[in-house]
C-alpha cells in the first residue's frame, strides 16, 4: 500500500476520532472474569483484607510482512537488513503474577513467564519501529520458561488523603496515603514503574509496535528480555511523584547475562510526574532523564580504529560481536570501554472525553555510543489517540491510531554507511532518513476478558534508510486475562 493510499485511509478515522468528541455517558462495566473475582464471589477471597493474589495473561500475535522495494539487501555481506520478500512471524506469551502481603506495607511479587517466538528477518532491519513489542523477550520457537520479576515492595505512609489501590497484577488491594514513600528492590522491568502512559504502555491491549511501548530512544539498562535487577524509590505528594532507580546493566549489549558490578556499570533514571484535571478530564505530564555507564563502543571510536588498522574489522574481532561477514567494515567490538550515555524525554497523556484519550512522547539521547538494551534509535517521538467503543455500544472495544518517527545521530549514520552493524540494523550502506511508522488497530472484546485485535502498520525508511521500503505489516492479536 502506498503512503498516499494510507493517508487517504487515515483521514476519515482521524476525523471520526478527534472531532466526534462529545462526552459519552459513563458506563459501569461488570467485574472482569478473573480467578480473584471468582474466588471472591464464592466467599473464598477477601479484597478488603487481601493477603495474596494471583493473575495471568495469554497473548498470541501473528504477523505478516509484505514484500517491499529495496535498492539493496545485506550489501557487501553486511547481515542486518530486513529481508525484502514477504514473511510471517509470531509471538506467544503466558505470564503469571503472584503477590503476597508480608507485613503492614510490605509486599512480595514473583512473576514467571513463558515465551515462544519467530521474528521477521531474525529480528534484523528495523531500528525503532519493531513491529511486535513481544519480540524484546528474546525467545525461540520452542517455549522457554523464565522468571521475569521477583521483587519486594515497602510502602511508608506519610499522611494526606486516603487512596484505594485495586487488586491487580503486581498490586495487592490496599489503601495508602496520598503522601507516601515506596521502595522496591529485586528483579523487575524498569518500565513497570517509569514512563507509564494510560494510552500507550500496556500494549497487549493497545498498539503492537515497540515505538509505542516507551520512548524508542530510551536505552534503559536491561537484559535481552527487558528485565534487570536493582532498586526503585518513589515519593508521592498528592498530584506529584518523583521516582529514582539504580539498576544493573547487561554484560554485553542486548544479551541475557547481567553484570552485577552495579556501581561500575549501571543505569540511573529519574522521573518527575504531575497528574492533573483539565476541563474535568484527567491527564499527566512526566519528565524523564537517564544516564547509563556501560562497557560500550562509540561510533566514532569504532570508525577510527578501522581506519587506523583495517585488520580491526567486523570479521576479526575475538570479543563480543554481531557476526558480520563484511571484512571491509568497522566493528564496535574494537572500541568498547566504559562510556556514558544520557537521554531526556517528555511523556504526556490527556483524556479529551470519557472515552477518548491522546498521548505524546519525545526523547533525545546523545547518540554517541552503541545501543545497549533497547532499539537502534537516538531520538524519537510518538503520538496518537485511543477511542473506546462506547460510541457504538461496544463498551470494551478500542480503536487506536498512532504515529512514530525516529532518528539516528550523524556518528551512528557514518558508522552504518561504512558497513558497520549494531544489534538490530546495518544494510551495508545508508541513505539516511528518519524512520516513520503509522499504526491502526481495532481491539474487539469477544467475551469476558478475551480480546481479538486486527492491526495494520505502514513502516517507512526501515533502519533509517531511504533506499529501502516502505513496508506493510499486518497482525492479528489474541489476548486473554485471568
PLM region descriptions:
Residues 39-54, 65-67, 99-108, 121, ...:
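Short loop/turn motifs that connect adjacent beta-strands in outer-membrane beta-barrel proteins
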Residues 125-142, 161-271, 420-425, 430:
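Surface-exposed coil loops of outer-membrane beta-barrel proteins
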